[in-house]
């Protein structure tokens, strides 16, 4: 969408130089359908995750704190999906006013940063728990986890402020529709470039480097443990999980990040070709579906790595209430690896060496 603006009677009016870009009948049908599916699956799944972690597992571990906050961040975003579904179904006609435009846009931005930051902290926590289980005990406390989550929510809120400030409702004269969109003046390129780079670097590059580094070090520690304990059969599932986590994150977000940056270049007038604008505007909602659907599945994905979580989850589905007594913390395959470099380990110690347990 290439926009030129003017002000008449105090109303912001926009001319769209590529009025047909991204406006395809299949988009107006497919995307609202996908949004609806994401909404139903996401609300159901993340609500159950919150109930299981808070009421059944009693929120006793660092990992459970991060997963709970991840699910809550997803729920905040999911509540705005019906607005975006209606918006797309109405062929990008925004009927909800300027305030909801800002709130819904900020929610999308907030979820991006909060979820990515939480996944990054979760990867660091897994690294500390697995590679340095004894040294990290004093640092991996519930207080530290809760304070970290508060900081993450504040950072995500600050990163979402541009959506509150600069996302507005505009009337496009040559298509006669009202849109909820960012609009940048072509002569002021600093702001959009800064926001675009912030989204790319802070919302993807830095977190991905940290996640990749954390799980690579975990991978090396596990391989070293298997070499030391030669008589213990290798559990390749753990390595598949590590690979899946890294690839899952990368391929979920790369398409959206690429097209988001291209959209900024189009807004600035760096890209003038309407055919390119059409490709970008068509691809953007599809990449959003990929990124945020996978994002909303993350709490379930990480949770189901644990036996206790699966047991409590199935217990909840069967309407079995949580027991009054407290339970041990979240048990996952992605948690604490403890091993001794000794060939005289007991069988129980050998078993725990490769079983990831959140402490």
UniProtKB/Swiss-Prot annotation:
Disulfide bonds join 18-274, 101-180. C-terminal Ser or Thr residues may be phosphorylated. One of its GO terms (cellular component) is plasma membrane. Glycans are attached at residues 4, 176, 188. Interacts with MAS1. Interacts with ARRB1. Interacts with FLNA (via filamin repeat 21); increases PKA-mediated phosphorylation of FLNA. Keywords: Cell membrane, Disulfide bond, G-protein coupled receptor, Glycoprotein, Lipoprotein, Membrane, Palmitate, Phosphoprotein, Receptor, Transducer, Transmembrane, Transmembrane helix. This is Type-1 angiotensin II receptor B. InterPro entries: ATII_AT1_rcpt (IPR000190), ATII_rcpt (IPR000248), CCR1-9-like (IPR050119), GPCR_Rhodpsn (IPR000276), GPCR_Rhodpsn_7TM (IPR017452). It comes from Mus musculus. It is a multi-pass membrane protein. The chain crosses the membrane at residues 26-55, 62-89, 99-125, 142-165, 191-216, 240-268, 279-304. Residues 1-25, 90-98, 166-190, 269-278 are extracellular.
């Amino acid at each position: 969408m290439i926009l030129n603006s003017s002000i008449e009677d105090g109303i912001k009016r926009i001319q769209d130089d590529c009025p047909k870009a991204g406006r395809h009948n299949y988009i107006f049908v497919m995307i609202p359908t996908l949004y609806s599916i994401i909404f139903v699956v996401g609300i159901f799944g993340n609500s159950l995750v919150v109930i299981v972690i808070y009421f059944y597992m009693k929120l006793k571990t660092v990992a459970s704190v991060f997963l709970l906050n991840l699910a809550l961040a997803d729920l905040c975003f999911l509540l705005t999906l019906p607005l975006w579904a209606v918006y797309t179904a109405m062929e990008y006609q925004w009927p909800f006013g300027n305030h909801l435009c800002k709130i819904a846009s900020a929610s999308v931005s907030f979820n991006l940063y909060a979820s990515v930051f939480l996944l990054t902290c979760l990867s660091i926590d897994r690294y500390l728990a697995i590679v340095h289980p004894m040294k990290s005990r004093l640092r991996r406390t519930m207080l530290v986890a809760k304070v970290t989550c508060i900081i993450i929510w504040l950072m995500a809120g600050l990163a979402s402020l541009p959506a509150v400030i600069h996302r507005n409702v505009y009337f496009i004269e040559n298509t006669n529709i009202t849109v909820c969109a960012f609009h940048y003046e072509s002569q002021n390129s600093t702001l959009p470039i800064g926001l675009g780079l912030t989204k790319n670097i802070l919302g993807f590059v830095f977190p991905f480097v940290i996640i990749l580094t954390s799980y690579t070090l975990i991978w090396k520690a596990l391989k070293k443990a298997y070499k030391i304990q030669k008589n213990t059969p290798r559990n390749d599932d753990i390595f598949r999980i590590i690979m899946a986590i890294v690839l899952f994150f990368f391929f979920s977000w790369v398409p959206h990040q690429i097209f988001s940056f291209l959209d900024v270049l189009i807004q600035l007038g760096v890209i003038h070709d309407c055919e390119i604008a059409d490709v970008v505007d068509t691809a953007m909602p599809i990449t959003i579906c990929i990124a945020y659907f996978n994002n909303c599945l993350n709490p379930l994905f990480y949770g189901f790595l644990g036996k206790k979580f699966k047991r409590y989850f199935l217990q909840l589905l069967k309407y079995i209430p949580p027991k009054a007594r407290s339970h041990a913390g979240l048990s996952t395959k992605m948690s604490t690896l403890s091993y001794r470099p000794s060939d005289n380990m007991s069988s129980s110690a050998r078993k725990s060496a490769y079983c990831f347990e959140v402490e």
